[in-house]
């Protein structure tokens, strides 16, 4: 299974270290790819969001299950997320996870999404969202394989 996370914005050094940490743990479960999508700085907020969303959409893996992370999405437990991931794994599906920048995402991307998830009603930076998503993916695979995930 391939998991691609496309995120708007440059990721800080400590976030990149966290990504390396989870890449090491996830290596035996999936092939992970994290793509930084350049932020747009010119134009109205609406134009910026449209362009950033378009750039994200262009990074969707062909034939993959598309997940969007958005505070308006569905909140699920770690066990429910593990069941969801197991189902995709059994179907042989790759996953593309899209994370917007500070101004959010254009509504058009939600039409491309198969599912929209929320980590919380709180708002997180795009970098922290990446790390939390990676932790939940790792936790889900540990649950799927019946391994202890409290480390």
UniProtKB/Swiss-Prot annotation:
The keyword rRNA processing applies. It catalyses: pseudouridine(1915) in 23S rRNA + S-adenosyl-L-methionine = N(3)-methylpseudouridine(1915) in 23S rRNA + S-adenosyl-L-homocysteine + H(+). GO terms for cellular component: cytoplasm. S-adenosyl-L-methionine binds at residues 100, 119-124. It is found in: Cytoplasm. CDD domains: RlmH-like (cd18081). Its EC number is 2.1.1.177. Gene3D superfamilies: 3.40.1280.10. Its main location: cytoplasm. GO terms for molecular function: rRNA (pseudouridine-N3-)-methyltransferase activity. It is an enzyme of class 2 (transferase). Pfam families: SPOUT_MTase (PF02590). Belongs to the RNA methyltransferase RlmH family. PANTHER family: METHYLTRANSFERASE (PTHR33603), RIBOSOMAL RNA LARGE SUBUNIT METHYLTRANSFERASE H (PTHR33603:SF1). Specifically methylates the pseudouridine at position 1915 (m3Psi1915) in 23S rRNA. Homodimer. This is Ribosomal RNA large subunit methyltransferase H. The lineage of its organism: Bacteria, Thermotogati, Thermotogota, Thermotogae, Thermotogales. The gene is rlmH.
